[in-house]
């Protein structure tokens, strides 16, 4: 399975797109997208015991390359979201939003812990923002409030990430109006949707090892596998399969809305890679027995999932090719 090494290669393309002038650059400002929406308050992180227990914080709490911030979400009843930020060296630089995998930072499934994203972007002179929460949420606006272990209360992640956060955060970072958004696994669906729902806001979008389709029987059950782990259901999130809101959140059905945005789309084959082996997890400090058990689960269950994701990616490519919408694939 190609995991985060390929994601960082894709990140290089995203960074290159942002740093270089491109045709069809983002035209909408955060203020225009937010409209009358109440905005986040961005401040220095005051870590809770939960945050202090997370691997990313343990590894980077004293690393000056990572700015530790937090932002409130008015639409989620003032919930405080930790942010890991790799700031640009200079003002007036672009911003890349990286969305975490299914378990997010709550389960150490985040970009900082699972990759060398800090080393990679440290001298790229772009602002990189990683929201360190949102496990199993699909980073979307839910129709109903779940009451699970990870999914509890209002889930209005798209509102937070596209309307509440960018204005205050980008102002604090002295950023310009060029931005990209990228997601992996679960959030690879989310990054496509946010670009579709906010045309003209993002210059580039990365979708790594995810599934654009959501409103078809098999793909809808993929949603269930993920959100059930957080204590929610796809019906609570987007309504019944094929409902208007589910179709609105199907990136394959709405692929035309990606026209004019630079696209980087990557999937895995389902074959095991270095980061699926016991030795990789032992090197990360895991107990050897747990490492071998986890590796076996990854290679069997993960292989099936990633093979399905590969099929999803080919479906999206076929649709985009038919529409003459260019994208870079890996």
Label each residue range with its predicted role.
Residues 2-330:
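Non-catalytic cap/lid and distal C-terminal segments of serine-dependent acyl enzymes
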């Amino acid at each position: 399975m190609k995991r985060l090494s390929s994601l960082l290669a894709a990140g290089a393309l995203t960074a290159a797109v942002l740093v270089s002038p491109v045709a069809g650059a983002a035209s909408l400002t955060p203020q225009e997208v937010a409209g009358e929406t109440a905005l986040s308050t961005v401040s220095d992180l005051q870590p809770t015991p939960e945050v202090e227990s997370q691997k990313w914080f343990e590894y980077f709490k004293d690393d000056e390359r990572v700015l530790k911030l937090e932002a409130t979400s008015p639409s989620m009843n003032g919930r405080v979201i930790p942010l890991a930020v790799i700031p640009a060296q200079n003002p007036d630089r672009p911003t890349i939003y990286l969305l975490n995998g299914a378990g997010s930072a709550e389960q150490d499934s985040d970009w900082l812990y699972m990759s060398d994203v800090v080393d990679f972007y440290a001298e790229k002179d772009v602002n990189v923002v990683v929201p360190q929460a949102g496990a199993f949420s699909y980073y979307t606006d839910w129709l109903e409030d779940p009451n699970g272990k990870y999914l509890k209360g209002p889930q209005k992640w798209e509102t937070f990430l596209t309307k509440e956060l960018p204005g205050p955060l980008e102002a604090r970072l002295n950023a310009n109006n060029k931005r990209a958004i990228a997601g992996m696994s679960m959030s690879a669906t989310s990054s496509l949707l946010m670009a579709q729902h906010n045309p003209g806001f993002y210059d580039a979008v990365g979708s790594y090892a995810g599934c654009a389709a959501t409103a078809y029987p098999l793909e809808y059950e993929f949603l269930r596998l993920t959100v059930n782990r957080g204590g929610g259901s796809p019906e609570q999130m987007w309504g019944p399969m094929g409902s208007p809101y589910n179709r609105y959140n199907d990136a394959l059905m709405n692929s035309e809305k990606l026209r004019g945005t630079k696209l980087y789309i990557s999937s895995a084959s389902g074959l095991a890679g270095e980061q699926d082996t016991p030795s990789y997890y032992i090197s990360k400090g895991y107990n050897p027995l747990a490492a071998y058990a986890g590796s076996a689960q990854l290679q069997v269950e993960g292989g099936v999932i990633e093979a399905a994701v590969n099929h999803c990616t080919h479906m999206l490519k076929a649709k985009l090719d038919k529409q003459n919408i260019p994208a870079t694939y890996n």
